[in-house]
Amino acid sequence: MVLSSADKNNVKACWGKIGSHAGEYGAEALERTFCSFPTTKTYFPHFDLSHGSAQVQAHGQKVADALTKAVVHINDLPNALSDLSDLHAYKLRVDPVNFKFLSHCLLVTLACHHPEEFTPAVHASLDKFFSAVSTVLTSKYR
């Protein structure tokens, strides 16, 4: 999916407003994913998946850091996320549908925390961005 210049601007502006809350939102989105899509828990058998768990918080920060890197390198997602794509495809073997689940939960989390900024245009841009990130992360599965 091609991101237009307006999409890129929307994503950068929204992510800029998230700022220091990115890790917190990443963890919240993970918790939402685990609750809404219980099969996603199978990839984390060694985690304490309870609300506020330090392990979920730490992984939420990793998710946020990866997305921040993607925002910074929005014009070159394949190169920016190549190592992460390798990890998920070859080592972790995460079912690609789980990226869609997490993307949905990220959208819900951002909408809850930033309702005024979460316009239909921003929603569409973020959805396209998360879809592009998911596509890159699953590109090495083939």
Curated annotation (Swiss-Prot):
Swiss-Prot/TrEMBL keywords: Acetylation, Heme, Iron, Metal-binding, Oxygen transport, Phosphoprotein, Transport
Record-listed Phosphoserine modification sites: S4, S36, S50, S103, S125, S139
Keyword Heme (UniProt): yes
Residue numbers carrying Phosphotyrosine: Y25
Residue ranges occupied by any Globin domain in the UniProt entry: 2-142
Modified residues (N6-succinyllysine): K8, K12, K17, K41
Residues where Phosphothreonine is found: T109, T135, T138
UniProt keyword Metal-binding present: yes
Function: Involved in oxygen transport from the lung to the various peripheral tissues.
Subunit field text: Heterotetramer of two alpha chains and two beta chains.
PANTHER family the record matches: HEMOGLOBIN FAMILY MEMBER, HEMOGLOBIN SUBUNIT ALPHA
Family note: Belongs to the globin family.
Stated name of the protein: Hemoglobin subunit alpha
Organism field: Panthera leo (Lion)
